[in-house]
Amino acid sequence: LILPEYPFVESQIQPASLDLRLGRKAYRLISSFLPELSAISSRLNVLDFYQSDLVMYEMDLTQGAILEKGHVYLVPLLEHLELPATLRARANPKSTTGRLDVFTRVVTDLNAGFDEIRAGYKGPLYLEVVPRSFAIKVRTGDSLNQIRFVRGDATVSDTALQKLHETDPLLFRNASSPKPLPHKEFRTER
């Protein structure tokens, strides 16, 4: 299912997710790129549409490296996936990453999107990283993103959610009052 390049560490395992770790190198890119229906590794050695290399240079993260504000980096992650056909995954930044104003998204081979990993995916994971407010220092093993695994359809209808709230309240007026918020007072539409 998850094939780490280095053994897992206990701190990676969260109640509902797994922290993904930065690999040994990062690529400084000219710009972000939309994943295409090809292997990401093949994009790292070819000319882009403007006939220039997509990769400006490669950085070693094993001793730590500075990622400059406003620049785009692509980092191969230590984890690889071999998902069964019935399991997909979603990735998102850790809350600490957001508080540091670092934009991140997971990229996979043969996928035209970000952060959504299709059922049955087998291959490497990459993280696009863009520090927005200031430079950051990262090293191999640091975690900026997390992954959650999904089987089946995990959505619930508005009606079902309202019925659940009636029998087992989900929202309360405030922390000091155990009185549930009437479902008419909250919106469940997207």
Predicted ranges, named:
Residues L1-R190:
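DUTPase catalytic domain/fold
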